[in-house]
């Protein structure tokens, strides 16, 4: 089945990473193009939903294009899984002072504050996910985390129960550790720090980030 295929591919990715045989190929490209591709493909697969792209900045970055697209697909797939049919899912590309921020927003059930710091763990599925019929093995966000951290980036999440979730991928414009067009092993996982706000903001949203 498609679910089993996805599980096998995810486990192979993690196995190659753990054995330090997973390579990144750094190339320069427009981050907007990757987001637009994910938007178009998602619209074809799930025509009942609306996929918007806003903000839509054109930002030249240096990264592994395939892996960055994989991150966006993981975030988009999750948004589709946990949102009501007919929802609007918004992808974003924004140029920042220090680089580029990619985002994915949904109107799903939201993630409880106490679970935000665990969603990037392997095989972890939050309580709201376990109560739905959505498929998933709890590996997607851990893979996204590995890829983002391998690019010296940061992965953030902002969520409110009943209002939806937004993921942010903050990336530098260049990768100092490898020359353009070169290959490099995806770095091994470090003991990442999960930072969770002790209080929700005025709008009731809680945030967490891994760095």
In which residue ranges do the predicted regions lie?
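Detector for a conserved hydrophobic position within an alpha-helical segment of the HATPase_c
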Residues: 147-148
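Short conserved segment of the HATPase_c
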Residues: 111-123
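Acidic ATP/Mg2+-coordinating residue in the GHKL
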Residues: 106
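Short helix-loop "hinge" at the ATP-lid/N-box region of the Bergerat-fold HATPase_c
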Residues: 79-80
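Conserved catalytic submotifs in the C-terminal HATPase_c
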Residues: 25-28, 48-60
């Amino acid at each position: 089945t498609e679910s089993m295929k996805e599980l096998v591919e995810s486990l192979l990715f993690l196995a190659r990473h753990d054995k330090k045989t997973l390579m990144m190929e750094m190339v320069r490209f427009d981050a907007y193009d990757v987001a637009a591709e994910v938007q178009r493909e998602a619209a074809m697969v799930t025509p009942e939903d609306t996929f918007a792209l806003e903000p839509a900045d054109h930002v030249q970055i240096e990264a592994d294009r395939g892996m960055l697209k994989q991150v966006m697909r993981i975030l988009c797939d999750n948004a589709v899984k946990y949102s009501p049919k007919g929802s609007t899912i918004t992808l974003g590309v924004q140029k920042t002072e220090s680089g580029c921020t990619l985002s994915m927003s949904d109107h799903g059930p939201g993630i409880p504050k106490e679970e935000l710091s665990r969603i990037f763990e392997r095989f972890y599925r939050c309580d709201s996910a376990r109560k739905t019929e959505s498929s998933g093995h709890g590996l997607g966000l851990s893979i996204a985390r590995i890829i983002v951290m391998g690019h010296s980036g940061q992965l953030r999440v902002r969520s409110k129960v009943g209002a939806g979730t937004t993921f942010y991928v903050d990336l530098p414009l260049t990768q100092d550790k490898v020359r353009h067009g070169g290959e490099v092993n995806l770095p091994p996982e470090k003991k990442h720090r999960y930072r969770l706000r002790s209080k929700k903001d005025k709008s009731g949203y809680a945030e967490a980030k891994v760095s």
